[in-house]
Amino acid sequence: MTETLKARLEFPNSLIQAQAVRTLVAAVLKEKGQNEKICQTSTKGPALESLWEQCSSDSTVVRSACCNALVLLVEQGHADLPYVLNTTLNLLPSARNVQGLIKVVGRLLQIQAGQRENRASFTCPYSIRSFPHPYITVLENRPDCWPALLQEIDDFLQLATDKDEPVFVEMLVPFLRYLYCEPQRLSENALLRQSLLRVLLQPREAPESDRLEEKGASSTRVVRELIRSLFDLLPHMLVDSVTAVVELSSFAESLTAALISHPELWRKELTRLALQLLCACQLTIHLGGELMSLLHTLHHIIPAHAEELPAEQVIMGISLLLLNASVSQQTALLDLAVKIVPPELPPPWGASLLVMPLLHVLSCSSLMEALTDTQTHTKNQKLANSLLQTVQREPARRKEDSMQLDLPLSTWYSELQVAVSVLHRVSTDSTSSSEWLYSLQSSLSVCENVPDTVCLLVSHLIFRSDGDLCRLALETAAAIAEADPAKVPCLLPVLMFKLSRVSDPALSLSVLYTLPKLGTHKLCIPQVLHVLQTVGSSSRLRPVALRLLALLWKKQDRVYPDLQRLMCQLDKSSVVMGKDTQWEQILARAACVRDICRERPYQHGGDMLAAIRDTLLQFSRKDQATPVALALQALQELCRAEVVDICSTWKALSPKLLSDTRPLVLKATAELLALVPDLNVKTEEYEKFGSEAVGVLWGYALSQDSVVASQGFKALSEYPESSHTILHLPEQARPIPKQPEVEDEVKQNEEENEEEEDISVPGASYVKLVSLTSLSVLPALETFLTALVRQEMKQMPRGVYHSALTGGNLRSDQGKTVSGIPSFMLKMYEKNKQPGLKPGLAAGLLLCYDLPVQTDKDGRPIIRFLVSRGRSYQQMLATFIHEVNIQPSEWHRSLLLPQAWRGFMSRAFHALLQGRKAELEMLQKQGKESPEELQYQQHYAWLWVRDRLTDVVKSAAKDSPVVQGNSILALSGLAVVLTRYESNLPAQSESGPEAGPDIFPTVHWLSMVIDTLLSIVSSNSNPKAQVFPWFVHRSYSGENTASVIARSCAALGLALLVPVLVTWRRDSIPSILGTLEAGLPGSATADESQALQFHSGLALGMFLAWLLDERVSDISGQSVAELLMKHLKRLEVCCFDPNLEYNAGCVLGVGLVLSSLSSSSQCERDRVHVSHTLDRLLQSLQDSSNNSRMMQEVVAYSVACVGVSAFSAGIIEASKAEESMNTLRALTEESQQTPGFALALGQTVFGLSSFGHGKAVDIQPRLLAAWTKILLAEGCPTMQRLSALNGLIALVGSETALIQMKSECEETSLQHSRLNEVIRAITQIITFSGTIGLQSNGACLLGHLHLTHASSRHSRTAVPQDFGYLSESSVIRASVDFITEAGRKGPEFTAPQRVKTLLSALAAVGADFQYPPVNWSSVLSPLMRLGFGEEVQHYCLELAASQTQSSQSASLFLGVWLVPPLVHSLSLRTRAHLYESLSCWMKHVAEDKLQVYVDSLAVQQFEPLTRLQRLSLCLSILHGLSRAMTAPNPPQNCWSVLCSTAEKIYNLLPDSIPAAEVALYEAMCSCLSEMSDAEIDRIVKVSEANVEKTAFILSYLVSKGRVPLLGLNDVISTILQVGSKRPISWLLLQGLHQSRFASGPNTGVSKRMEWLLELMGHIRNVAYGSPSVKCVDVLQGTDFLLGVFAAAVVSWADHGGPLLVGIRARWFPWPQSAELCHGLYANPEDTELPVASCLLAIPYSIRKLLDKEPWKSQSQKFIDWLFSITEAPKQAFSETAVLTAKAALMALRSSSEFKKKTVWTRAYGW
C-alpha cells in the first residue's frame, strides 16, 4: 500500500476514505488480471492484502466499505466465495475489530442461501462438526464478539423476512443447534442464548409489501420456520443445573408465546411442549429449582389442548410432582390438575391416581396452615377437596394415548410411560393386579427406596378395588412401609380415605389392621398413633383401637405410655355402653395384657401383674372363661421369662385354679404348668412343687373333657419320665403286683417295701393308656408317648447297641439254648456207646457241628488252636462220610442231606482256611520258609484247602454205597462253597504271585465235579473233561454200575450245584435239567429203582427251586421263566398221575418249586398257577386215603410248603390257608402215629402264625403243649412220640430253611421261648430216653433245627426279635410288644387308631434316632398284611425307612414292599413318603429293589394319563429325588439310578408348561441342579418343540446361579430360528432379574456384564445379516433380542425398575390361589406386557446402569452399540426399536463420553 493511499484511508473524512477504498479495490482488480479469479491458489498482491487489512479497521467507513467491497467481488465473480469466507474466519481471532468481518460472513451466507435454483429445496451446507457453521467458528474463536454476531443474525433474519426466504432460517439451523444444545453449555454464551431468543422470536414485518395479505403470508413463513427450528431444539437441550432450568424456562416461555399465536397451526407441537414442560418440572424439583415459571407456561398451553394430552401420563406426572412440591408449588399444580380433571365432566380414566397426592396435599396443608399464606392455604384446601370429590366419580372410558414423546427432556418420562403401562396392565383384570402385587411384595425385601410411581399404583388399587384384591393391596402397602418408611405419611391417608368409603365390615377390619403395620419408623409413629387415637375416641371402637395400638406397640415400644393410657381408659370409662361392647373391651384388655407379657416381659411384665390378678379374681362365671385364660397365658409368659417365680405364683393361685372346672381355664392352667421342667431349680421346695404339678396334670390328662385331657398330655410331654409314678396312672394301667410263692418271700417283700417302694412306671403301663384313652385324645397321648420315647433314646447307653447284637444283654433263656446245641451234640456223640444211636447222632452232628474259636485274654484267636480246629474238621469230615446213614426210604432225611453237607463243608472250608493261614503265620514267625514262598502259599491258601478236603473225600470214596453217597454230597457242597468264596475274592492284581503248575485251576476242578456227577447219574453223559476216578460207575461195556444210593446222591448233588452252574456252566443247565427229567417216573429212560425215581423227582424240584433263588433271567438266550414252566409242568404231570407208583419225589419237588415261585415271582400268571396247583395238592391230600403212608406224608408236606409260602406272598387269602391247616389237623388227629402229618401241620401252623394268621396263632400253643406232653410221656407208643417230635420241630420253624417265605417272616420273642422249650424237651429225650429210634431221630432233627436257625439268608438270631433286653421301664420295649401283639390278634381285637398312636410316636423319634437292634420285619409285617388300614401301613413303612441305616431287617422288610405286587397295595401318601425319604434308605436296600421303585415305578407316574391324577405323588417323587441327589457321597449305583430317573422324568414332562403342574418343573430344576454341567447340557437340549420347557428350566437354573448365563444362549438361538413365542421373553426376564441375587461365580457382575455385551454383539450380527447367525425373520428377531436386552438392563440397573415393572424376586411369590389361573405365569395372555414395559424403561434404566461401576467403564461400548441400531438398515429394526435406541442415547447425554462433539452430534443426527 502506497503512503498516499494509506494517508487517504486514515484521513478523517468519509468522502476521502471512500475514494481511497475505491482506489484500493481498483488496484485489487488490476492485480488479479482480466480473466483470473481471486481464490486460495491465486497470487496475493499488496492491494488485496491491504483490502483484507482494512476490513478490521477502526474506521467505520473504511471497514464497512472494504467489507462491502469483498462481498461485491464475490457477487461479481471476481473472488471465490469459500476463499473469502475462510480468509474472513481466519482473520477473526486476531482482528482488532470484528464487526465488518462478521458482516462479511453474514453477507456471504445470504449469497449461499440465495444460490438455489428455482425454489429447489435447500439444505444447509454446514453442520456442527464436519463442516462447522461459520458462526460456530466465530463464536468458538471470538466468544467476545457475540453482540456483533447477534446484530448480524438480526439483520440476517430481517432480510429473510423482507425477501420472504425461509431458507435463510435453514442456513442458521446448525448454529442454533450448537448454541442451544451443545452439552457443555458454555457460560460465556449464556447472554447470547438469551438475547438471540428474543431476536429470533421478535415480530417481523415486510415493510415493502404492497398488500396486507402478502405481508402476513411472508412473515408467517419465516417465523413458522423459525418456530419449528426452535421447537426441534427443545428435546436435545441438556438440563443438568438450575441455570439450565432457568434458560429452559425462558426458552419454553418464549416459544410458547410464539406457538400460542397460531394455536390451530401448532396443536401437536403445543401438546408435545406441554409434556416436555412436565418433564422439565420434574428436573427442576430434582435440581432444587423453582417451578412457577414452567407451571405458568403450562397453564397457558393446557386449557386449549387438554383433549390432545395423554391424560394418564399427565395425571401420573402431576401426581408425582405434587408428592414432592412445596406448598406454593402445589397451588399451581392443583390448578393444572383441575384443568386436566375438570369438575363439570366425568374424570378421565386414571384420575384416581390423584387420590394419594391430594390426600398428601390436604395433610400438608393442615400441618403448614400456620406457616402458609392464608389465601394459598384456602385455595389449596379448596382445590384439593374439589379434585377429591371429582376423582371419586365414575371415570370416563379409557382412551388410547396417541401422543407420545419420542425424545423427552428427561428419562423421568420413561418412568411415566412404564408406570402408565403397568396401570393399564393392573386395571385389565384382578389376575393381573394380583400377579403384579405379589411380584411387588417379593421384590420389596431387597429395595430400600420405593419409587413414588409404585406407591401411586398401589394406592390406586386400594382405592378402586374391593375384597381379596384390596386386602392384597393393603398387605403390599404394609410391605412398602416396611421397606421404605418414608412412604408411610403418604400411604396412611389413603388407608383412612378407603376406610371412610368401605361398606364391607370384613374389609374395614382389614384396613384397620393394616394401620399399625405402617409404624415402621419412629418418625412415622405420631401420625399412626394419632389415627389410632382418633379411632379409639369412639367407645364402640375402643376395643379395636386397643388391639391396633397393641400391634403398633409390638413394632415401636415408644407408644407404650399411650397403650397404658388407653387400657386405663377402658377401666375408668364412665360412658354407658352395651354388654357386647363391654365384653369386647374386657377381652381386648386381657388380650393386650397377654401380648405385652409375651412380647416384652422384662420391660413391662411387672406392670401387668395387677391386671392379671384382677382378671383372675373378677371373672369366675362359666361364660367368663376367656379373659381368665388370656390372663393365665400372660402369666405363663412372665413365668417363662422368669419375671415372676412360678412356684410362688402357683402357691398364690392354686386354691382358685384347682377349684376351677371351666375347660378353657384348665387348658390354660395346664399350659402354665408345662413350664415347670424348663424352670427347674434344684431345691426341695421346687421338687415338691414339680411333683404337685405332675399330679395336677395327670388329673387333667385323665379328665372326661377331651380338650382338657389333650392339653394335660401335651403338658406332661414336657416333663422327664422320672417325674411320673404309677400312682398317677389309672388303676387299669398300673402293673399287676407280683404274688410271692412262699411265706418267706412275703415277709422279705414286706421288709423291702417298708424300706422303699418302687413306684416307677413300667413302659407297659404307659402303653396301656393307649387302650384306655378316648379316640379324640389319642393325638395328644401320641405327643406324650413321643416325648417319652425321645427321652429314652437320648439317654440310651451306647453299649446297648453292641451288647444286643452280641447277645450280652439277651434274656438268659434266649439265644443261648440254640447256640448250645453243637456242644451238646458233640458231647453226646463222644460219650455214646450204643451202636444203634451212632448214625442218628452223626447225622445230627453233621447238621450242627461247629467248633468255637478259642481266644486269648484280649479277645484275639489263639493261632495254634486255629490249626488244630482245622484238623478237627478234616477228621470229622472223614467220620461223617462213613457214619452218616442214607436211607432212601426216609424222604425227610433226603431233603436235609444236601443242605447238611453244604453247611458242614462251608464251616469246614473256612475253619481249615483259618487254620492254614495260622499255620503259615507260625512258619513266618519261625522263619522256616522264605517270605516269597510264604506269600505265595498265603495267596493260594484257599486252593490248598480245596485240595486237602478233596483228598479227604477221595480217601473215603471207594467204600460202601452210603459212603459214596456222602462223598458225592460232600464234594458237591465243597464246589458250592468254593464258587461263593471265589466270587467274593478281589480281582487278581498284576503284583500278585502267578499260579504255579501245582495249582489246579478252579474252573477245571469245578468242571470235573459237574461231569463226575453227570456221569454217575446218567449213562448217556459224555464228560467234556476228565472226571474223578474214585467212583467206579462204568463197566467196560459202558453200563452204569454205580449204586442206587450213589446215583440218588449225585442227582441231589447236581441240584446242590445250581450256584456253580449259574456262575461257570450256565449253558449246561438245560441239558442237566433234561438228564434229571429223564429219570422221572413214567419216563422211558427212568430207572426201575424206586429210590432213584424218588430222588430224580426231588432233585429236579430242588434244582428248579434253587435256580429261582439265583434270580437268573435267561440261559443261553432262553427265558428262565419258560424253562422253569416247561420242566415244572412235566414234574406236575408226574405228581398228579394216579397211575405212577414212585412219584413221591415229584410231589416234594413240586412243593419246593411252588414255594420258591411264590416268593420270587411277581407275575400274575405264576401267582394264579401257584394258587391252582395248591388246590390240586389239597384235593389230592383229601383224597389220599388209599395211598401209601409215604405218599400221604409227602403230599401233606407239599401242601404245607406251598400253603405257607403262598399266604406269606399274599397269593391266597387267610380262609384258604385255614382250610389247608384244618385238613392237615384232621389228618394228624386221625393218624397220630404218622410223623409226616405232624411235621406238615407244625410247619403250617408256624408259618401262618408268623404272618399273623389268627387261627394259627391260637392253635400253636395248644399243639406245643400237647406234643410236648406226648413226647415226654414214656408210656406213649414210640411212633406217636416220634410224630410229636416231628411236629414240635416244625412248630418252632425247622422247615423254614427248606421252604420259601417272604424275607420279613421272622420269629418273635414268644416263639423264641417256645423254641427253647422244645430244645430242652428234645435234649431230655436224647439224653435220658431208652428208645433208640426216638433218640436217633431226635438227634438228627435237633441238628436240623440248629442248621435252620443258623444258616438262613438273614439269620433269625442275628438281631433280637424284640426289645426284651431293655429294662421294663422302657416305653420303646412296651410299644413294640403292644404292636407285635396287635399284629398277632389282628384289627378285630386292637383298634387301628391305637396301633397308629404308638407307631407314629416310634416313627417320629425314629426320624432323628436309630433304635437299638431289633427285628423290625417280624414286628411290622403282620400289621402290613392284616387289615389295619392305610394309616398304620404308612407309619410302619415310615418307621422302617428311618431305621434302614442301622437295621438290615428294616432294609429287607422295606425292600419287600418296594416292588410289585405289594407296592401297589400302598396308599399314595405312603408311596409319596417313601419317595420323599429316599435319601434315608436308598443306600440300604437291594439295588434291584431301588431300581424297580425309583427308576421304574416312579417314572410310570409321569405318564400323561397318570400324572394328571397323581400330581402330589409326582411332586413327592421329585422332591425325594432332589434330596437324595443332595445327599453327600451317594454310592455310584444309587447315583446312576437317581440320574437315570430324573432324565426319564424330564423327558416325560410336557413341553408346554401346564397351569397346574408348575411345581413339577421347579422340583425337576432342583434335581438337575445337582448334576454336573455336562449332564445338564446333555439332558436339557433346546428344540423348537420343547423351547418353553427348556427356557424355564435354564432360566430357573440361571436364577439360582447354578448354570452360567451362557446357558440361555441356546434358548435365544432357537427362538431366532423358529420365531418368537410369547412366554419365552418373560421367562428370560425373570431368570435374568433373579440371577442378580444368586451367589456364585456364574452370575457375578462381571459375568453378567460379559454376557450382556455378548448379547449386544449378537443383536448387531442379526441386524446386519452376519452369516454366522441364523434368523428366520430379522425384524421379529431383533425385536425379541431387544426385549431380552431390555430385560437385562432393567433387571440389573437398580431395584426400583423391577419393582415398578413387576419382575419377581422369586419364581413363585404367591401361595396357591384360585384367582391366578396359571401356577407360573398367573395370566399367560399377559406375559408380553412386562417385557414391553421393560422396553419403555430402557432410557430410564440404561442411565442408572451406566452410572455405576463396573458398568460405567463400558459406556462407550453401549453408545457405539446404540448407534449401530439408529444407523442400521431400515429392514433390520422396527421403528419403535430405533426410537427406543435414540431415547436411550439421549438418556446418556450427561455422561462424559456423550459430551464429546463427535458423539453428541452423531447421536442427534446433526
UniProtKB/Swiss-Prot annotation:
The keyword rRNA processing does not apply. It comes from the Eukaryota. GO terms for cellular component: cytosol; focal adhesion. It is found in: Cell junction, Focal adhesion; Cytoplasm, Cytosol. Residues 733-760 are annotated as: Disordered. Pfam families: DUF3730, Focadhesin. The keyword Cytoplasm applies. InterPro entries: ARM-type_fold, FOCAD/RST1_DUF3730, Focadhesin/RST1, Focadhesin_C. SUPFAM superfamilies: ARM repeat (SSF48371). Keywords: Cell junction, Cytoplasm. Disruption phenotype: Gene knockdown results in decreased overall survival and growth retardation. Mutant fishes have pathological liver features, including swollen hepatocytes, steatosis, fibrosis, and hepatocyte apoptosis. Its main location: other. Signal peptide: none annotated. GO terms for biological process: regulation of post-transcriptional gene silencing. Required for the maintenance of SKIC2 and SKIC3 proteostatic levels in the liver. May be involved in the regulation of RNA degradation by the exosome complex. This is Focadhesin. The gene is focad.
